[in-house]
Amino acid sequence: MNNYFIGKVLSGHHINNNGNGNTLSRTALTPTNNNVNRGDLVTNGLTPIDNNFIGSNGFIPRNVTRKDPFRKRTTQEFIREWTEWKEKSASLFTAPIVGVITSTLLEALKKLVAGRVLMSLTNLLFPNNSTSTMEEILRATEQYIQEQLDTVTWNRVSQELEGLKNDLRTFNDQIDDFLQNRVGISPLAIIDSINTMQQLFVNRLPQFQVSDDQVLLLPLFAQAVTLHLTFVRDIIINADEWNIPEAQLNTYKRYLKQYVAQYSNYALSTYEEAFRARFYPRNTVENMLEFKTFMTLNVLDLVSMWSLLKYVNLYVSTSANLYNIGDNKVNEGEYSISYWPFFNTYIQTKSNYVLSGVSGYAMRWSYTNPFFGEYIQDHLYNITASYIGGVNGPQIGQQLSTTELDQLVQQQARADIPVDFTQIPINCTLRNPLEVPYYATRFNELTSLGTAGVGGFVRSDVFISNDSVCGLGTNYSSGQTFYPDYYITNISATVQVNGTNTDISPLYFGENRAITSTNGVNKVIAIYNRKTNYDDFTNIRGTIVHEAPTDSTGFTISPLHLDTVNINSYLYIQENYGNNGDSLRVINRAIIKYRLSAARSVIYRLVLRVSGTASSIVAIYENYPVGSANQINTGTDNEGVIDNDSKFIDLIFNTPFSVSGTARELQLQVSGATTSSPLDIMNIILIPINDVPLY
């Protein structure tokens, strides 16, 4: 038999690879001679390694660059993009309609003019007067959870969907009749229609909260709640046009606040209970991230927007993270739920920087084994993310010195009979991180068949932008994981379990704590986020500079996207489930600065969503005080929503300020927070001066 690796055995640290050009696949076979059998077969001779290949990677989604984040989008665009995603990307059984609904609702929040969001959502969720789309959400959840409703419950839920569809259709028709004055309907009749629809919602929502099937029904519940809340919001926003009396209007404002809290608490507590139960006593990080991603897409993204429905004319630039994680199984390890807070902080510790590249070190070993024959084994030893401004994240895995490499070679030689090995440095750098970021990844572990049977594994850890495909094993698998309107904001990894105790205390914000393992990296992880409004000055400062919308729309800022803080160890990341991302926890007196830019002058008021206690918060814009709050205690004064023990209030600072120019400073000074009584900054909201929250 002919060897495909030529040269001196263990002759040195160099590439020595004569391959026949075939690519790897999961079902491939190994030829037993030098003849090329078929183009889809695995061979022991691999195609030359090129871990920074520039060129086309086949399918490219529609929205892969961050250009023009404020442009108006249409529902048809959302339908095309999410349908395309379902066909081309790993989808965790998620129905594309859930992404369409979220995108449509985000677009609706940006509009100042009155409108009928309920009618738009009704047409999307019940197209052609059918319940099939809502049933698709339920079936997808059953597939992912791997449980099914019993026949009786399924039939009851189907009947409720049919009833809800008919009720919505009747209500929308009645509003149409009133607005078009086709039948001379009086305002009193419209009020009757509104009150009837309100009662129908109140009666039907409990049918999606069946005690033994709460998790299965949660995505359906989230859609039904969104319909109810947008119904109430439409009434408030259109009160003048619909001739709604002031007393009735105040009632529905009270309803909006009441139902946001009631529905949010049910959804958040159901999710948290399911997350903890699913991973008790132990489970893999892969399962944790897949469950969180599924629930974010299907439930938590909507919950995050419910509490923002009281605002109009608002661009929501923040989002919870989505994930893609490798499927490697070697030395994977399982963790208890207590590991999660540590993990959630280390994958976000550089959240205020923009990802610019990935580096790492791998080796590809080839062996001759009496049982497997010749086979290949990949080993990824370490990986590090880099960011604009020359900033590096923590190194994850094992850093090999020359001595350690020589020892490793000898250790491998004792374990088997190596034919040769190849060093594979990974150096991926984005050409334009702001406008052309990584938007997709491909993480696979592929079986490398030996000449006498199953052998080792080869890895594909690939990062994809609009103009590059880079990483380990760029030629060995196809497919990609992406999400419409999301971009990759960080690359991280888990390490292979080797019995050593890891410090799993949560990282303070910005901490560079190396995550080590003598066995190296196990799974690479991509973190996706919806953030797009980066000002070009980010390239100069390194940290994020937030660009204000060009049409005087309000906008949100993630508290994690800060510029500087007086002492980093005073800040931590606090997980929230329904908050468009996590909070910034303050445990001591902190001075936190953010940077804003605007192409033209826009006058805003500042709203801070906070949870916890502090003696004071002072907000200063360009050395100009814009507001303060004293003796904050949201345990007794809050909006009724409980999100991972956070009870929040929106503090509105009424002093207006003009955002104009580049990299202007917004400073938050927090006093009186402690480790035992922290203050969480959950969201930073800038609303146009003349906009008033609905409640």
Swiss-Prot record:
Keyword DNA-binding among record annotations: no
InterPro entries: Galactose-bd-like_sf (IPR008979), Pest_crys (IPR038979), Pest_crys_dom-III (IPR005638), Pest_crys_dom_I (IPR005639), Pest_crys_N_sf (IPR036716), Pest_cryst_cen_dom_Cry2A/18 (IPR015214), Pest_cryst_cen_dom_sf (IPR036399)
Domain of life from the UniProt record: Bacteria
Any single GO BP term: sporulation resulting in formation of a cellular spore
Keywords: Sporulation, Toxin, Virulence
Keyword check for Transferase: no
Pfam family, one: Endotoxin_N
Any GO MF annotation of the entry: signaling receptor binding
Function: Binds to the brush border membrane vesicles of scarab larvae and damages the gut wall somehow to allow the vegetative cells of P.popilliae to enter the hemolymph.
Family that this chain belongs to: Belongs to the delta endotoxin family.
UniProt name for this protein: Parasporal crystal protein Cry18Ca
UniProt organism field: Paenibacillus popilliae (Bacillus popilliae)
